[in-house]
Amino acid sequence: YQIFPERFANGNPEISPEGALAWDSSIKPKTSDFFGGDLQGIIDHLDYLQDLGITGLYLCPIFESPSNHKYNTTDYFEIDRHFGDKESFRKLVEQAHQRGMKIMLDAVFNHIGSQSPQWQDVVKNGEQSAYKNWFHIQQFPVTTDNLANKRELPYHAFGFEDYMPKLNTVNPEVKDYLLKVATYWIEEFDIDAW
């Protein structure tokens, strides 16, 4: 059962993003809107999901990110603060397992967020960046200022969106980093799959 956490259920309004909309809003949601869904909201509905016969939960990205969709990750080792924290995630995994449900995380390893430390190092240091080979860069600087056509980005990006630079997954350093991420969540939180 796939869950988009930001829109599933708000179990802890205290951690909702500033300006989060009410759940019963009659507006047509925009891609920039937040409603405050979180991990506690999922925990609160585990009995309901179990009653439906659900045996696995596939969570869209839950990692630190400024967007509502979280596909532009800034830190793969942190839960986004608007979703909760590592202890609330641990609680979700444990309670799901008690109900016979598996937990799968969305492995967004094709690209990373432009606010990630790795990409920001490339922006700041250009060709001298220790991370320049982590990405598919055509030319320096990697600025998008005055860019008339997204297809002319000086680097490859997911969906030509400048805030999601593509990772060079052939690079051994990138592979090692992503394997550390995957291993961390399995070993520390007992997730079942990516």
PLM feature spans:
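Substrate-binding/active-site clefts of carbohydrate-active enzymes
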Residues: 5-55, 62-190
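Phosphate-binding beta-loop-alpha motif at adenosine-nucleotide cofactor sites
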Residues: 192-194
